[in-house]
Amino acid sequence: MSTDKITFLTNWHATPYHAPLYLAQSKGYFKEEGLKVALLEPNDPSDVTEIIGSGKVDMGFKAMIHTLAAKARNFPVTSIGSLLDEPFTGVVYLKDSGITEDFRSLKGKKIGYVGEFGKIQIDELTKYYGMTADDYTAVRCGMNVTKAIIRGDIDAGIGLENVQMVELAEWLASQNRPRDDVQIVRIDQLAELGCCCFCSILYIANDAFLAANPEKVQKFMRAVKRATDYVLAEPAAAFEEYVDMKPIMGTPVNRKIFERSFAYFSRDLKNVSRDWAKVTNYGKRLGILDADFQPNYTNQYLSWTLDADSTDPLGDQKRMAELQKEVACEGGFKRLQVASSA
């Protein structure tokens, strides 16, 4: 880039779980590191890795599966840290849609997806349930999955437990319908992945930018780590400050999305090697990665002591599901206590 600013492109329009990034800006953490950072939002989330890979933007957010696929397509990007760890992702639907927890109930339905990999995932699942990709209608919705379900344009859509499910639950409440009429069939469970890490949201960067600016990148990550520490220590105050910077965040729905995202924030921002191995294998299974593909991540720009990995990741997933149910019912800020290796 010709500017001395770091340019950073988010994976979505400004969203409650982007709080650490925006707070690093508003609280002056970037400035204290001697950095100027321009925060940008995409028109189409599917363009993010291409824009960063082409060098038009330096850094950004993207999910793990998309980051791997970007390298496979020769877009030179690398993950340098994690924002959200393993947010539950799946087919989100309303109870009156005729869809159930049985994947085969998608037959004959219109299923919305954000970008092409959502369709690839559903297509791949059909073969395990005696179906083909022709047994359902795929509808590309971009950032409008929730609206498409509400309008009846689709019967279900791929979404996040902490975003689209919250939006739909609040819409249901506005219609005097039970909030739990929104349901999710998790893709990780359907695909027997053993983790929901394919949709972990990552900090990614252009490889040439990384090579030329290692100290800048380390400073950037130190600033967002400081902001993450603040979010985890003072979530209510942090959200109010986020609303001050981004008034569009100041709605009851966004507050609930923030509460539901709180448990997913990565405390130490590290890339989890075990998760990368699982998702790389999943990408090979989906046919989007070659057999000899090597994952594109590093923790070398994280200058603090990293937490040990969990000793019970599958158990953590079950406990996280229960914890998120509690937050959905009661609100507030809760996080999982994770057992880790010494």
UniProtKB/Swiss-Prot annotation:
Q: Which CDD domains match?
A: PBP2_THI5
According to the UniProt entry, what is the EC number of this protein? 2.-.-.-
Tell me the keywords, alphabetical order. Answer: Iron, Metal-binding, Pyridoxal phosphate, Thiamine biosynthesis, Transferase
Q: Which reaction does it catalyse?
A: N(6)-(pyridoxal phosphate)-L-lysyl-[4-amino-5-hydroxymethyl-2-methylpyrimidine phosphate synthase] + L-histidyl-[4-amino-5-hydroxymethyl-2-methylpyrimidine phosphate synthase] + 2 Fe(3+) + 4 H2O = L-lysyl-[4-amino-5-hydroxymethyl-2-methylpyrimidine phosphate synthase] + (2S)-2-amino-5-hydroxy-4-oxopentanoyl-[4-amino-5-hydroxymethyl-2-methylpyrimidine phosphate synthase] + 4-amino-2-methyl-5-(phosphooxymethyl)pyrimidine + 3-oxopropanoate + 2 Fe(2+) + 2 H(+)
Cross-referenced Pfam families, in alphabetical order?
NMT1 (PF09084)
**Could you tell me which SUPFAM superfamilies the record lists for this protein?**
Periplasmic binding protein-like II
Which sites bind pyridoxal 5'-phosphate? 115-118
Q: Which cofactor does it need?
A: Fe cation
Residue ranges crossing the lipid bilayer per the database entry: none
Disulfide linkage = none
Class of enzymatic activity (EC top level) = transferase
Q: Which residues carry this modification: N6-(pyridoxal phosphate)lysine?
A: 62
* A molecular function (GO) term: 4-amino-5-hydroxymethyl-2-methylpyrimidine phosphate synthase activity from histidine and PLP
Specify whether Iron is a keyword of the entry.
Answer: yes
Instruction: Find motif (CCCFC) and give its ranges.
Output: 195-199
This entry's comment on induction and repression of expression is: Repressed by thiamine.
Q: Which superkingdom, per the lineage?
A: Eukaryota
Assembly mode: Homodimer.
* Xref: PANTHER family: 4-AMINO-5-HYDROXYMETHYL-2-METHYLPYRIMIDINE PHOSPHATE SYNTHASE THI11-RELATED
Q: Which family does it belong to?
A: Belongs to the NMT1/THI5 family.
Name-wise, this protein is: 4-amino-5-hydroxymethyl-2-methylpyrimidine phosphate synthase
| Annotated source species | Aspergillus parasiticus
Q: Which gene produces this protein?
A: nmt1
